[in-house]
UniProtKB/Swiss-Prot annotation:
InterPro entries for this protein: UPF0304_YfbU (IPR005587), YfbU_alpha-helical_sf (IPR023146), YfbU_helix-hairpin_sf (IPR023145)
Entry protein name: UPF0304 protein VF_1794
Pfam family, one: YfbU
Domain of life: Bacteria
HAMAP family in the record: UPF0304
Annotated family: Belongs to the UPF0304 family.
Amino acid sequence: MDMTNAQRLILSNQYYLMSQMDPTNAEKYKRQQLIVERGYELQIRELDKDFGCITETECREIIDFMEMYHAMQESYNMLSEECQAKVDARRLQFLGFDIATEAQQVNYVRFLTSSEGLYPQFDKADHHFNSQMPMLDKYRRMLTTWRNCPRQYHLCSTELAQIFNA
């Protein structure tokens, strides 16, 4: 992150104000203030790690994943009890993404569910959409299979199994 001295001064003052306003996190803000004031470039890079960018295409893809899970859940609810017994209902839960390798995606899902109020039926449980394993490639394979289904919101147990196993 390249900053002029004026920008560093402004940011330093912001961290100072935050340390005064939020005593529980004061040490964190004082540390960040010191990093900015002294220009420690290695540590400055950690300050901008949360400033990510997800393209419109990536956002739409994540929404498509979530919509696919919504469709699978609704399809499951419309199945007879006999057909429901053939489906592992645990696999209908949208797990989210891996916070270690897919942090931007996790944060976007959290934004959609918390701030935007979308998909309230998704159980965030204790993990809050941190799957703790990379999921992007898996979701892409599942999405391809789901899109090939003729009735995407009226899936049978066989189609659900095909999507899960993609």
